[in-house]
């Protein structure tokens, strides 16, 4: 009985196996034999007549255990009483059948065989150990070449390969015993077992000190690393060659009889059978002393069979089964989505679950869901059985079963009792963030569909068009508790991604609330006064006052002191009704709803109520406004017909005007005044402006207020109400219905020049319809592809961040990052208050210009403090950030700040990494699904000027202006900025001026809002003459570096610089334009005294002729920028992935590494050499090679600052980290990622991105190993590095020097310290091979590892319980230790001592550990 109890997984009394870590290492032959219960000698599986397993076969009962519980094979011993007896007839132990899942067997191999993982998994471990190439190894292993193992006194060298003939010749020459050479895995095994690891490591270290060059040290380091890992892990190299092959238990490779006498079997049995057959044949051949060549062939076949068993298809052809299907080997069992890790360990199927279609349940409360009776009966069966038994209605489970099956009335009563206050979990796939699973209290309903509360739809992303949801029942009391306290829908009002309420009315509800809070002039009852809400309701019911009439009413309010007061408001009956639902609170006054409520406003109202009135009040409020919204929308009866789509009368005049404009552009193009590209850009611009104008007219007409004959205001247009309230439809969609559809994009993103002038109400012409199919089709294709991409991005993010958990309250770091308002193209896109909200201040925040403290250091910035910061016009704030957190594992609560979904400081144990990954990944899918709604409509129109967004005084920084012949100011510098300063001297906006921009304002001038500040050409980059003179062409040779483009349409030609490097003659050309002094014929010089020359880049269009006189400020040439591509998240998702994968962009920008002056050096082949001479003499000058023909925005003698771009393009994030540091990198990543999401109107809090970037910065690269064991170029964790360096410094040795490196999320996940987590992510075999050689230990710190080994995760309640357990265990340990010490001292007193105890004896009682061995 005892055994059964201890191995039964559902037995609560069985002691749980406790362990703190899991180690993986190589198995020695002895170890394999110790696992084995017997040798498998025959390839037979089972006897096909009796269906009994064959003796000594792959399913042998003697080795693996009985087939039926407590019954031997021949049937001599049956039942429990013979437990443990071994039958003398069939040799089977009488025990549980379950042991067939755990007992292993083995095969004694007749010849050693190399393990394919250590041979072929790159870099080949066997190859590294022996310092041989993989090709040579394979030649030896597959019996092509001999290898010299012991050269003796001959001229041969160790490890030399020889062919058969050479071997025989050498034997003739030196004699057979003069040297040893061998072939096959035996040879490799001999060589491996001869290796003295410590000696090798010493030699390699010596070599490393002397090695020079690039490759040699690298190679030595690689070998040294693997030798060290063998030394540390206690593995022996020869264990990579197998002499004994383990056989996994038969139940894990089952053989199942199908009907009709056929069998289904696991592929492994086939693979094992091949191995056994070949092995037995080889044994026989060796006994028979067969010719060498035959034995050798058999050995090679054995090697191939074992290879196929371990990893089919890794080498040679794939071994296929009967139906030409590749057999699944042991490696394939682990790999991929269907492998052991992802299919069975991380994703299990769950008992007590059901699924059904969902329908809306508007009469439910927020914490309820409707559960069909039939489903509930099935799900809660065990509970019902136990309750039936407790009530004495049934005495056995069988009886209870019958009762339930008959659905007797008492069963329904009991079901009611069972379900009361027993929450269930509802889940909708795909579960993209944690709000995809929430708990509800079930309400029993008739019918077969689950009823879902309408307000939680947005969290689940559910709608009622046939979606299905799954129900799960939390069984244990703890699970029910967690479901209620943590997962109840009422506890998840705020979104973890941005902290805004996610329980927000949508669609009908919004429309109803909008209609309720409308105010219209001239309605019945206007100007009446009411004393109370009840009176208003009375008047409404009597029809004396209209819902939208303006009235005066007295309303109860709470003042600042908390007293109840009555205030008078001018309002409408509708708003009064809504105000009556607001909880009474000074912070939620009636003014909150005394206005026209759109969707955003409703969200703000809910947010305010949640922040100030608490959770309970706000949940009740949400339920009430939901009911009101539905009711009022239903009463209003808003709907629309085709006549509600208004087409503005001014549409055709506008269109015709633009048509004339476009004709004019065509004419200019024919006359050659503009290029094809410029014409295209201008036409696209004109049409896009036209489309906007028509849309504007339509919106103006549709939203215009109209009056009836009596002078009362009419109801607004229904379509306008729907769109304006935020219920459904966008201005872009309305534009397509009633304005003009506008420009369309081709599938590659280019915009088609001819727009669609019709709208859907007028109907499209055939050509227009054809043009619009591109966009529609691209939308659908995009969706399908990007759902997968987005899911994969989320998977990688979760994997990299899964072990980032809040572990401590405060790490006490001094580091912080600076937060300031996010500005995009001069416009504030997210104010400072928004960015610091929910963060901890790292320094006191002061009112500018005084020392009044707004927020003290270490305080959490809540809404109130954020508003104070905003009002005080603080420019930037130092805040704590997960990036700079110095917690050993995970992050600390102070650096993370507020838990966005709770609104308080984050709790210890919160899995912030996963929350961050889900918050970034979840919108990815949403965005992908949003591309086609607008159907590929192009957003044309490039901005070409900038207007002041604020009033203030203009201030130029680093001005560098030139006035051209027309008196316009042209920007000539790279670093010029224009700032707008307000009266208080605070900077309100700064704009970077691009080279060639025209400035319309003067320094110190005061500007109003919308004053045009400067303009630029969005399509080309001009190159401008600094001084007047004569242009002279250098190396601009027609046909080599210049091509003349003649436009077929116009007959005009223009000169374009072509790629001169691709022509045979053009290798050394340096095309440029020099400005000459017409008097002296010398080149003109600039202030720095350098000759003025303009190097040309490829595709530049020349605007002057050779020898033409130019004036200062004239355009010499124009470089075209890329045409207007449509911005679509298509660019977005890959962009986000590219940022997190830290890929180097193709033509990445070159960033200056220190401040200094630019010098152009001697050119090298087709690259130009730029050096920066630093201002600081202690630094060396840095050289950059830039491909010729790339536009370089700096000139000889320019001063550049550290971090300036010397070559345009996207910067590589690694460069930013190296040159400007972690904070600059974080800012870059945050801005770039947020930019993508902002375009789609998705809000994500910065801290999520910071958490992911923190996980990407976990590793350090060793630059100099000092006197530590770390090797140069190795990547180590910060914790490891500190530990090693501390140890070195304690011993007075030189510490290693390292710098942080940025890893992409895939790389970072694969390099995590936990091999279980890495193996379950990607490249399983590679990760496991590496881990086993190093003898890695998995400390089980992350979530994934713990899920895989079947424990509670160390986050949330799991973390708390494990902490409590640890405390208890330590306490017990202390007691046990003191008891033991007491007992020992008592024993010592009792024992007589003769003479002095020798304390210096060998046995000092210390266990030899790694630590005291080093001393």
Swiss-Prot record:
Highest rank taxon of the organism: Bacteria
Key words, A-Z: DNA-directed RNA polymerase, Magnesium, Metal-binding, Nucleotidyltransferase, Transcription, Transferase, Zinc
Q: One Gene Ontology cellular component annotation?
A: DNA-directed RNA polymerase complex
Q: How is the cofactor bound?
A: Binds 1 Mg(2+) ion per subunit.
Enzyme's top EC category = transferase
Task: Write out the GO biological process terms.
Answer: DNA-templated transcription
Transferase found in the keyword field: yes
Matching SUPFAM superfamilies: beta and beta-prime subunits of DNA dependent RNA-polymerase (SSF64484)
Describe its assembly: The RNAP catalytic core consists of 2 alpha, 1 beta, 1 beta' and 1 omega subunit. When a sigma factor is associated with the core the holoenzyme is formed, which can initiate transcription.
Q: Function of this protein?
A: DNA-dependent RNA polymerase catalyzes the transcription of DNA into RNA using the four ribonucleoside triphosphates as substrates.
Designated name of the protein: DNA-directed RNA polymerase subunit beta'
Name of the encoding gene: rpoC
């Amino acid at each position: 009985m005892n055994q059964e109890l201890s191995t039964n997984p559902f037995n609560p009394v069985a002691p749980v196996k406790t362990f703190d870590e899991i180690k993986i290492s190589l198995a020695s032959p002895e170890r394999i034999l110790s696992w084995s219960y017997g040798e498998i000698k025959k390839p037979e599986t089972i006897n096909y007549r009796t269906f009994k397993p064959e003796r000594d076969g792959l399913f042998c009962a003697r080795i693996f255990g009985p087939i039926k519980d407590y019954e031997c094979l021949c049937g001599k011993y049956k039942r429990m009483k013979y437990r443990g007896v071994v039958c003398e007839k069939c040799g089977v132990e009488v025990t549980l059948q379950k042991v067939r899942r755990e007992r292993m067997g083995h095969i004694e191999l007749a010849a050693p065989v190399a393990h394919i993982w250590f041979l072929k998994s790159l870099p080949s471990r066997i190859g590294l150990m022996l310092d041989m190439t993989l090709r040579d190894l394979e030649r030896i292993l597959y019996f092509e070449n001999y290898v010299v193992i012991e050269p003796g006194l001959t001229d041969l060298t160790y490890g030399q390969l020889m062919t058969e003939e050479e071997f025989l010749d050498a034997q003739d020459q030196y004699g057979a015993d003069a040297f040893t050479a061998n072939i096959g895995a035996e040879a490799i095994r001999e060589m491996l077992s001869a290796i003295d690891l410590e000696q090798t490591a010493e030699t390699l270290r010596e070599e490393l000190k002397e090695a020079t060059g690039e490759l040699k040290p690298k190679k030595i380091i690689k070998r040294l690393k693997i030798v060290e890992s063998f030394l540390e892990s206690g593995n022996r190299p020869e264990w990579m060659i197998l002499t004994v092959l383990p056989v996994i238990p038969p139940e894990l490779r089952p053989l199942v009889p199908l009907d009709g006498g056929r069998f289904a079997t696991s592929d492994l049995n086939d693979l094992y059978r091949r191995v056994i057959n070949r092995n037995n044949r080889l044994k026989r051949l060796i006994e028979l002393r067969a010719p060498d060549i035959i034995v050798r062939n058999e050995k090679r076949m054995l090697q191939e069979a074992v290879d196929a068993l371990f990893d089919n298809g890794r080498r040679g052809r794939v071994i296929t089964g009967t139906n030409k299907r590749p057999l699944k080997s042991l490696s394939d069992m682990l790999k991929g989505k269907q492998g052991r890790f992802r299919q069975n360990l991380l994703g299990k199927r769950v008992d007590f679950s059901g699924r059904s279609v969902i329908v809306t349940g508007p009469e439910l409360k927020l914490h309820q869901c409707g559960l069909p009776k039939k489903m509930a009966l099935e799900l809660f069966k065990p509970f019902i059985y136990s309750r039936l038994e407790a009530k004495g209605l049934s005495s056995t489970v069988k009886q209870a079963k019958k009762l339930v099956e008959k659905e007797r009335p008492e069963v329904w009563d009991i079901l009611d009792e069972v379900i009361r206050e027993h929450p269930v979990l509802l889940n909708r796939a795909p579960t993209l963030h944690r709000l995809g699973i929430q708990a509800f209290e079930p309400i029993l309903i008739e019918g077969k569909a689950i009823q879902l509360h309408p307000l939680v739809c947005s969290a689940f992303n559910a709608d009622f068009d046939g979606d299905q949801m799954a129900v799960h029942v939390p069984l244990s009391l703890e699970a029910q508790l967690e479901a209620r306290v943590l997962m109840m829908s009422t506890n998840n009002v705020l979104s973890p991604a941005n902290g805004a309420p996610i329980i927000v009315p949508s669609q009908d509800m919004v429309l109803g609330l909008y209609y309720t809070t409308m105010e219209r002039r001239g309605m019945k009852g206007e100007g009446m006064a009411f004393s109370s809400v009840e009176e208003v309701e009375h008047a409404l019911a009597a029809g004396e006052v209209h819902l939208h009439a303006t009235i005066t009413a007295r309303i109860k309010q709470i003042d600042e002191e908390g007293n109840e007061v009555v205030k008078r408001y001018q309002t409408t009956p509708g708003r009064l009704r809504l105000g009556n639902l607001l909880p009474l609170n000074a912070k939620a006054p009636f003014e909150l709803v005394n206005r026209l409520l759109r969707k955003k406003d409703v969200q703000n109202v809910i947010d305010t109520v949640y922040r100030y009135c608490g959770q309970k009040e706000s949940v009740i409020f949400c339920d009430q406004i939901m009911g009101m919204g539905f009711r009022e929308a239903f009463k209003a009866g808003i709907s629309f017909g085709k006549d509600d789509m208004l087409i503005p009368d001014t549409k055709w005049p506008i269109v015709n005007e633009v048509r004339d404009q476009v004709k004019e552009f065509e004419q200019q193009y024919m006359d050659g005044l503009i290029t094809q590209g410029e014409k295209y850009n201008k036409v696209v611009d004109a049409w896009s402006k036209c489309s906007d104008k028509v849309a504007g007219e339509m919106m103006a007409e549709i939203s215009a207020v109209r009056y009836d004959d009596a002078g009362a205001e009419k109801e607004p247009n229904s379509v306008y109400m729907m769109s304006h309230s935020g219920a459904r439809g966008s201005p872009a969609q309305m534009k397509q219905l009633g304005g003009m559809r506008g420009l369309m994009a081709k599938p590659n993103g280019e915009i088609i020049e001819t727009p669609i002038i019709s709208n859907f109400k007028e109907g499209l012409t055939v050509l227009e319809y054809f043009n619009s199919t591109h966009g529609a089709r691209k939308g659908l294709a995009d969706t399908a592809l990007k759902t997968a991409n987005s899911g994969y991005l989320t998977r990688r993010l979760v994997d990299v961040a899964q072990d980032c958990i809040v572990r401590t309250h405060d790490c006490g770091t001094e580091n912080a990052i600076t937060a300031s308002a996010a500005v995009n193209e001069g416009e504030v896109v997210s104010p400072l208050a928004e960015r610091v909200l929910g963060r901890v201040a790292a320094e006191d925040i002061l009112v500018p210009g005084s020392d009044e403290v707004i927020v003290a250091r270490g305080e959490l910035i809540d809404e109130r403090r954020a508003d104070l910061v905003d009002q005080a016009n603080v420019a930037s704030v130092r805040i704590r950030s997960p990036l700079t957190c110095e917690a050993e594992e995970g992050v600390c609560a102070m650096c993370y700040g507020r838990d966005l979904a709770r609104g308080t400081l984050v709790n210890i144990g919160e899995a912030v990494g996963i929350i961050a990954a889900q918050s970034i990944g979840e919108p990815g899918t949403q965005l992908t699904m949003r591309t086609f709604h607008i159907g590929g409509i192009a957003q044309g129109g490039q901005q070409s000027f900038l207007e002041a967004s604020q009033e203030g005084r203009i201030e130029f920084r680093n001005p560098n202006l030139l006035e051209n012949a027309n008196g316009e100011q042209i920007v000539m510098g790279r670093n010029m900025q224009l700032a707008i300063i307000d009266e208080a001297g605070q900077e309100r906006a700064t704009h970077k001026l691009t080279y060639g921009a025209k400035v319309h304002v003067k320094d110190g001038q005061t500007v109003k809002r919308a004053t045009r500040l400067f303009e630029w050409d969005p399509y080309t980059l001009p190159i401008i003459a600094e001084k007047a003179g004569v242009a002279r062409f250098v190396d601009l040779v027609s046909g080599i570096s210049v091509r003349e483009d003649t436009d077929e349409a116009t007959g005009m030609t223009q000169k374009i610089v072509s790629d001169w490097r691709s022509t045979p003659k053009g290798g050394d050309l340096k095309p440029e334009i020099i400005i000459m002094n017409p008097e002296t014929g010398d080149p003109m010089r600039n202030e720095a005294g350098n000759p003025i020359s303009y190097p040309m880049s490829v595709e530049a269009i020349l605007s002057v002729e050779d020898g033409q006189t130019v004036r200062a400020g004239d355009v010499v040439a124009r470089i075209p920028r890329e045409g207007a591509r449509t911005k679509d998240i298509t660019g977005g998702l890959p962009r986000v992935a590219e940022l997190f994968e830290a890929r180097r962009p193709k033509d990445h920008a070159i960033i200056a590494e220190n401040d200094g002056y630019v010098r152009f050096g001697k050119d090298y082949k087709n690259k130009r050499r730029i050096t920066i001479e630093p201002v600081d003499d202690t630094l060396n000058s840095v050289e950059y090679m830039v491909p010729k023909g790339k536009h370089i925005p700096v000139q000889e003698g320019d001063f550049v600052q550290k971090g300036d771009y010397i070559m345009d393009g996207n910067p590589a994030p690694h460069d930013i980290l190296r040159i400007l540091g972690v904070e600059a990198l974080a800012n870059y990543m945050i801005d770039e990622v947020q930019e993508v999401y902002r375009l789609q109107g998705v809000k994500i809090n910065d801290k999520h991105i910071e958490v992911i970037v923190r996980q990407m910065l976990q590793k350090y690269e060793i630059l100099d190993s000092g006197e530590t064991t770390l090797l140069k170029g190795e990547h180590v964790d910060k914790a490891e590095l500190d530990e090693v360096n501390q140890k070195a410094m304690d011993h007075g040795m030189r510490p290693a020097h390292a710098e942080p490196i940025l890893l992409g999320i895939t790389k970072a996940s694969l390099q995590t310290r936990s091999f279980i987590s890495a193996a379950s992510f990607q490249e399983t075999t590679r990760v496991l091979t590496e881990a086993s050689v190093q003898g890695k230990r998995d400390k089980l710190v992350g979530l994934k590892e713990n899920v895989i080994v079947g424990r509670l995760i160390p986050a949330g309640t799991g973390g708390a319980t494990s902490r409590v357990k640890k405390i208890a265990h330590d306490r017990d340990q202390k007691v046990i230790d003191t008891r033991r010490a007491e007992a020992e001292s008592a024993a010592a007193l009792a024992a007589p001592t003769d003479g002095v105890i020798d304390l210096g004896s060998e046995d000092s009682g210390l266990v030899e550990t790694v630590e005291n061995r080093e001393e």
